[in-house]
Amino acid sequence: MSEDIRRGPGRPPKKRVVPNFERKGILEKPVRPQSRLEFSYDNPLIFKNLFIYFKNLKSKNILVRCTPTEITFFSRDQSQASFVIATIDGKNVNHYYASDVFWLGINRELVEKMFNSIDRSFLKITIVHRYDKPETLFFIFTDFDIDKECTYQITVSEPELDMDLIEMEKSISEERLKNYPLRWEFTSKQLKKTFSDLSNYTELVTIEKLGGDTPLHLYFQKFNSISYHEMYKSSNKINLTSTIPKSQVFQINVKIAHIKSLASAMVTDKIRILCEENGNLIFQSEMDALLLNTITLNNMI
């Protein structure tokens, strides 16, 4: 056995050499002539985490919209109170091509099982949809250390579109997001702890902020029983920003069960929370090229 291969006890293994993948972004033509969609990305675990999130929310079916510039995943949680919209911009991946705008329907449980078998040995995922096999979506995973390629063929359908779900995309348009009066950031741990603790005492919590440089205030009060107040006094520590005029008060009541289930499902370390005047909440996080938005409707209370 050569000296390069033999290792003494306790000595760490040789450092893995990771290929340098160029991110070319959007292509004018596909690499494979039969492709209607081609998506190549050097971070397969992002998809694994996304489908773990869908699993945690007990989502069933997932709509996939492919456009010439991006791919977007739409789904609902089990309670139907939250809507998930996850987008990957084609310019941020190794290469991306979609011939036109089209929709695919995939079963979450089927795809989830596939991603369960994917670990860090796989450094690239390629997704292909072909003109000659419209009922099939190809997932190709590559392990460059041993030059292994694993290909899954998943049956897809032309879905019945959930227009209420798709309409939720307007809530996260660039123009709409500018007008949200209150936003801040929590770690996933803080979000989970806050709403888990609150759930022991009450079903509703009030989120409140006065205009100007004032703390974020979460509280509940039960008549002749118990009250609780949670104040965030340093806006910079939670990246708190607001457009609330000094003479006004922003206040909404939120159903804790909806937020608690989301907090338990989160797969990112940091979450940006945006509040709309009608009480709707947006939970926004990022994983490399993926932008993950979850919209929770206050009128579902």
Curated annotation (Swiss-Prot):
<comment type="function">
    <text>Plays a role in the inhibition of host innate immune system by acting as a negatively regulator of type I interferon production. Mechanistically, interacts with and prevents host IRF3 nuclear localization to inhibit its transcriptional activity.</text>
</comment>
<keyword id="KW-0426">Late protein</keyword>
<keyword id="KW-1113">Inhibition of host RLR pathway by virus</keyword>
<keyword id="KW-0899">Viral immunoevasion</keyword>
<keyword id="KW-1090">Inhibition of host innate immune response by virus</keyword>
<comment type="subunit">
    <text>Interacts with host IRF3.</text>
</comment>
<dbReference type="InterPro" id="IPR046938">
    <property type="entry name" value="DNA_clamp_sf"/>
</dbReference>
<comment type="similarity">
    <text>Belongs to the asfivirus E301R family.</text>
</comment>
<dbReference type="GO" id="GO:0039548">
    <property type="term" value="P:symbiont-mediated suppression of host cytoplasmic pattern recognition receptor signaling pathway via inhibition of IRF3 activity"/>
</dbReference>
<keyword id="KW-1092">Inhibition of host IRF3 by virus</keyword>
<keyword id="KW-0945">Host-virus interaction</keyword>
<protein>
    <recommendedName>
        <fullName>Uncharacterized protein E301R</fullName>
    </recommendedName>
</protein>
